[in-house]
C-alpha cells in the first residue's frame, strides 16, 4: 500500500501546450458533429465579434487536463473528473494544465481528491476537481 498522507499539498506536474492547434479543432468539430463555425472559420469568429481567432472545443481543453493526470499517475488513474469552463481558449494560445492534491479520500484504495485547472496566459480558463487513484509515488 502507498502511504498517501505526504501527498497532500503536492503539485501535479504541469502539462504545457505551446500552441493550441487549429487543425485539431476542425477535426474535433467534425468528430463531434459540432456545426458551430467558430471552431474552424475565422470569418465566423469575426462576424460574432470575437476577433480573428477560432475557439477551441471544451472536450479538447478537458483532454489537456486528463492527459496531465495520466502522465502523472497512469492511464487508469482517473476515477472522476468534474470541470467548469470559465473562459475560451483560442487557436495558437499557450495553455498549461495543472493541479494539486487536496485530500486523501480512502487510504485503502489509494484515492485522492485533486484541484485541477487549465490556464491561458496566467488566467484560469477551466477549473475543477478530480478523484485520482494513486499508482505511483
What spans do the regions from the language model cover?
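Solvent-exposed, flexible loop/coil residues
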Residues: 24, 35-36, 42-44, 59, ...
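Hydrophobic beta-strand-centered segment that forms part of the acyl-chain substrate-binding groove
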Residues: 47-101
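Intrinsically disordered, low-complexity segments enriched in polar/charged residues with Gly/Pro
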Residues: 4-6, 24, 32, 40, ...
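A broadly tuned preference for mixed-charge, low-complexity surface segments
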Residues: 40-41, 52, 63-70, 115-119, ...
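Catalytic strand-loop segment that frames the active site of acyl-thioester-processing enzymes
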Residues: 1-54
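HotDog/MaoC-like acyl-thioester-processing domains
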Residues: 1-16, 88-137
Amino acid at each position: 500500500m502507498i502511504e498517501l498522507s505526504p501527498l497532500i499539498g503536492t503539485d501535479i506536474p504541469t502539462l504545457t501546450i505551446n500552441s493550441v492547434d487549429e487543425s485539431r479543432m476542425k477535426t474535433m468539430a467534425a468528430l463531434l458533429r459540432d456545426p458551430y463555425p467558430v471552431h474552424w472559420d475565422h470569418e465566423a469568429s469575426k462576424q460574432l465579434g470575437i476577433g480573428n481567432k477560432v475557439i477551441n472545443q471544451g472536450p479538447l481543453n478537458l483532454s489537456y487536463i486528463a492527459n496531465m493526470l495520466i502522465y502523472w499517475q497512469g492511464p487508469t488513474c482517473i476515477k472522476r473528473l468534474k470541470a467548469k469552463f470559465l473562459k475560451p481558449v483560442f487557436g495558437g494560445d499557450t495553455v498549461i494544465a495543472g493541479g494539486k492534491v487536496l485530500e486523501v479520500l480512502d487510504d485503502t484504495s489509494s484515492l485522492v481528491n485533486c484541484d485541477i485547472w487549465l490556464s491561458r496566459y496566467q488566467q484560469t480558463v477551466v477549473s475543477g476537481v478530480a478523484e485520482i487513484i494513486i499508482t505511483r509515488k
